[in-house]
Each structure stands twice: as structure tokens, then as C-alpha cells.
Amino acid sequence: MSQTIPQITTGPLPGSRKIHVPGSLHDIRVPMREIAVSNEPPLVVYDSSGPYTDAAVQADIARGLPDLRGDWQLRRGDVAPYPGRQVTAADNGFAEGARLTPAFPLRRDPLRAAAGRAVTQLAYARAGIVTPEMEFAAIRENEGRLVAHARDGAPMGAELPDLVTPEFVRAEIAAGRAIIPANINHRELEPMIIGRNFKVKINANIGNSAVTSSMEEEVEKMVWAIRWGADTVMDLSTGRNIHNIRDWIIRNAPVPIGTVPLYQALEKVGGVAEDLSWEVFRDTLVEQAEQGVDYFTIHAGVRLHMIPLTARRVTGIVSRGGSIMAKWCLHHHRESFLYERFDEICEIMQAYDVSFSLGDGLRPGSIADANDEAQCAELRTLGELTKIAWARDCQVMIEGPGHVPMHKIKANMEEQLRHCHEAPFYTLGPLTTDIAPGYDHITSAIGAAMIGWFGTAMLCYVTPKEHLGLPDRDDVKTGVITYKLAAHAADLAKGHPGAQRRDDALSRARFEFRWQDQFNLGLDPDTAQAMHDETLPKEAHKLAHFCSMCGPKFCSMRISHDIRAEAEKQAGMARMAEKFREGGALYLPVAESVAEAAD
């Protein structure tokens, strides 16, 4: 077994340590990252990295993360353990022998809702119950702040409180404007919230394929992605060993895990879309729900009459799930089983509190196809399905495009809010131009920052490998850092309270030539320091009042220091001169005093 355990990345980020903030309503400890800053109080920031960056924790992925939520669920008294379904050869793509990834060593009986009970965060919120998950998420959002901070921005309809309370979280979930993806079988989860009245979140995609990657790589990709700030992770595996790899990932994931169950269902029928059936798909939903998947992408909005609308597109149907279901619909000349059986899907989602991520199977795959009738028709259907899911106490977010030029992005957000009743929007980018293969993390981050400002709640990252290949570890980091930047830019534009604290702290460090603080306060300390040290590697250079860009004579900030010092010197001299003038008026020369006395 030891040979199969991946070497994962652990340890704090430079200049940082893990701290925990206690709850007041529930017995919880919420993790955050504290960054040490010279000559200033430390800066506390949101932290999704889990125990892997805690110096006091020895990670053992063969045991998985601690059971954080089990007691919460049992105290509620509305769940019941049961034996669960048996794992079949089809679950792992019929892999066998040396090709079969070992099963995760620990197995618990799965939980599901007790008869007649609703165990979703939406059901609790509607009943006025503030769960530990809700308080946990609320505390995270405040990033250690106890008081309001000055804010500057245009919220674009968002209602951002100075401080997020557990009651505010409950109310937003009850209204359908936010979700806490938290399958009752993902007991290791550190709960988080997705909604436009909270910090903009990001998702990282990982997953093996039929031609590359392994369990070792995928677990490390997950840990690596959350180290750099991924708030959720989607496992989009399409090759063999899907079940076992997913188990290893979930048991070691402190963040919500999402999937597209259709991919595994397709593997179970040999990759032939026409052979898919409701029975195979339903079995796959239950399988993944028992494992603890927190949200499912369900492409139920692809309807038969919409498919011809894509015929004249430049790039047709680019969603894998969308194309699979379109092919099935055309072959069987009927609506998809995802649409026809949506009520039954809701029953499964409700029993385990799996959140819906209603998929945009007809999203535009090129800017030429942006905002066309196929895209809009599907969006309207997703709005109808949202109401059906809400009626069954299921949490819902809506997936969005895709490829959209900048001038059409705002309309996407407005249409989503209108047709989907303010359910959280979750977008892939969007990519704002199609001319940059190898740089689509940049083309998409432009659109992501914009749509995040306009109201998107979560951004799905794009890596440099988009359209080119399966991302590796380095691509994952590049994608996550790029999207953390886009999400933070959106928070600043919206006027999120406290968002600018980190910018201001780094700006002060930059002006004062505190190089180590600059590195540590950045999104990627390692890369920042490596770039600095390429040309100024000596320790003495960490104290230098210049960098290699300008050198000592042309550094604008050094010159600004000189200007400030000179201005202060002149201001001081002016103050002294004023004092002398005041003194001259109080103490007249002797001759004048005698003359005045004689008069």
C-alpha cells in the first residue's frame, strides 16, 4: 500500500501560520491563514488549504482527514446509516489486476436522510435553523475581522454586509441566493458558501483521462490546487479507476468536490452515448452520493427542440455533457432522461444534500456563438428546473459560459439573474477572445473578473492547457493563481468589505522596500521571490531600496522617499519660521518698548 501513496505537498506558505477562530453558536474552530507583516499587525486571510498547511498536523492520506461533521449530523438526528451499494467492476471502468487502483483503506457505512426528513442546508435555512455549517461559513467570510472596514466599489446589485453573520448566511440560503455544498457523507468537509453577496469563489478542475494521469497525480493536484486557493474542486475523470480515485480524493478533501456523473455513466456503457439509460445514470448518482460528492453537474437543460439551434454555430456544442445528451436525444427522438426524470434526481439530491450545478450544455464555444438563441433557450429551462429543485429543498447553482466578448458579458449576468431567480451563477471564464491557445487562462481571466464584478458567485478556472491537453501540476497552479487574481479584482470592484486590506498592506511594504513582506503578502510568494532573486539573489538585496528593473538611481519609490523627506524638511522649516514670526509679535525690540512706555 505504501507504494501507492502519493507524496503530497504540505507545510505553511512563506511567512504564514494556521490559526483557528472559535464559533459562538456551535463548538467549531474555523481555520484561517495569518500572514506575518513587519512593523504591522499580522494580516488574516481566507484559507481553503485544509490541514495540509498546518505545521502542527502530520498528514496521512491513507487515513484521510478527520471526521469534522459527523457529530453535527448525528446530533441533528435526521440521518440514518445503511450498508450502501456494492462497488462493481463497471464503477472502475472494468480495470483489474495491476491496472486497478487500490480502494481507499477506510470504509464507513454511508448516511442518507431518515424517512420523511429533509437534510439539506436549504431545508434547515427555511426552517429558521442556523446549522454549524452556516456559522462556519459566516466566520470564514469575515477573515478574522471584528469591525467594519472602509470600502470602495460599485456592488452592481449585490448586498454586502459589513460583517457576515450566521443569520445572514441562513437568510441567503433560504432565499436561494447562496448554497453550502455539503453532502452528508463528506464528513471531512470544511463548509464554505457560494453566493454573490459573499466573496467570489473559484473552482479548479482535475481528473484523469483514458490516456493519462493516475490516482497519485490527482490527489496531489487536489492538495496543490487548494494550497493556492481553490475553493472547490471538480473531479472530471473519464478513464478507468474513476470510483477508487474519487474515493481517495474525497476522503482527503477539505473543500467541496463536484463531478459530472454523466461521464462515469458513459464509461459504464462502453462510451456509447446512445446506450445510456436512466437506470445506469441513477445508479451512478447514488454511487457518487454515497461517496460524498458535494455537487453534481446535471445537463438537464438540453432539450430536443433546442439542438437544431446549434446547427449554424461556428463551434456547435462544445460541452462534453451537452454533446452526449444531444446525441442521445437525437438517436432516441425524445427528451433526455435527465429532463424527464428530474423529479427523481431531486429525490436523490435531497436525500444526501448534494447540490445541483445545472449544466450549460449549450454554452458558446466561440465568441461568434455568444448569447445566441440556443444558449438563451437553455438558460430559461434551467430557471424552470431551479424552481422544481427548490420546491424539493435542493440547493441549486447555475453554470454559465463559455466564450463571450467583453461587451456581451453584462447581458449574460442580467439574463441569468432574471431567468434563474438569483440562484448563484458559476461560470467558466468567460473567454473574451479565441486567438490565444496556450494563454486562455489570461483570455478567460479578463472575462472572469468582469462577470465576477457583475454578480457571478463562483468562477471555474481555465489553465494554459485549455483546448490543448490535460493540465499537469504546474498548469493547475497557474490556473488557480490567475483565477484568485480575477476573483479578488471582482471583490474589489464590488466593494467587498475588507477586500482592500491585503492590497494596502502590500502597497505599504512595496513603498517601504520590505521585500519579504511583499513576497509573503502576494498570491504566489514562491514565484515572486524567485523572480526577484534571479537578478538580486543575495540576502543583502532583501534590504535594498531598489530592484533590478530601475536600479538605485532610477527607482521611483526611492526618489519618492527623497521627495517626501525634502517636503517634510521644508514643512518643518516653514513651521519654525512661523513660530519665529509669532515670537517677533510677542516680544518687541527694546527701543520700541521704551518708546511705547513713554507715550
Curated annotation (Swiss-Prot):
Keywords: 4Fe-4S, Iron, Iron-sulfur, Lyase, Metal-binding, S-adenosyl-L-methionine, Thiamine biosynthesis, Zinc. Zn(2+) binds at H403, H467. It catalyses: 5-amino-1-(5-phospho-beta-D-ribosyl)imidazole + S-adenosyl-L-methionine = 4-amino-2-methyl-5-(phosphooxymethyl)pyrimidine + CO + 5'-deoxyadenosine + formate + L-methionine + 3 H(+). GO terms for biological process: thiamine biosynthetic process; thiamine diphosphate biosynthetic process. GO terms for cellular component: cytosol. Substrate binds at N205, M234, Y263, H299, S319, R320, G321, D360, G361, L362, R363, E399, Y426. Its cofactor is [4Fe-4S] cluster. InterPro entries: ThiC (IPR037509), ThiC-associated_dom (IPR025747), ThiC/Bza_core_dom (IPR038521), ThiC/BzaA/B (IPR002817). Its EC number is 4.1.99.17. [4Fe-4S] cluster binds at C547, C550, C555. Signal peptide: none annotated. One of its GO terms (molecular function) is zinc ion binding. Pathway: Cofactor biosynthesis; thiamine diphosphate biosynthesis. Binds 1 [4Fe-4S] cluster per subunit. The cluster is coordinated with 3 cysteines and an exchangeable S-adenosyl-L-methionine. Belongs to the ThiC family. Homodimer. Catalyzes the synthesis of the hydroxymethylpyrimidine phosphate (HMP-P) moiety of thiamine from aminoimidazole ribotide (AIR) in a radical S-adenosyl-L-methionine (SAM)-dependent reaction. This is Phosphomethylpyrimidine synthase. It comes from Paracoccus denitrificans (strain Pd 1222). The lineage of its organism: Bacteria, Pseudomonadati, Pseudomonadota, Alphaproteobacteria, Rhodobacterales. The gene is thiC.
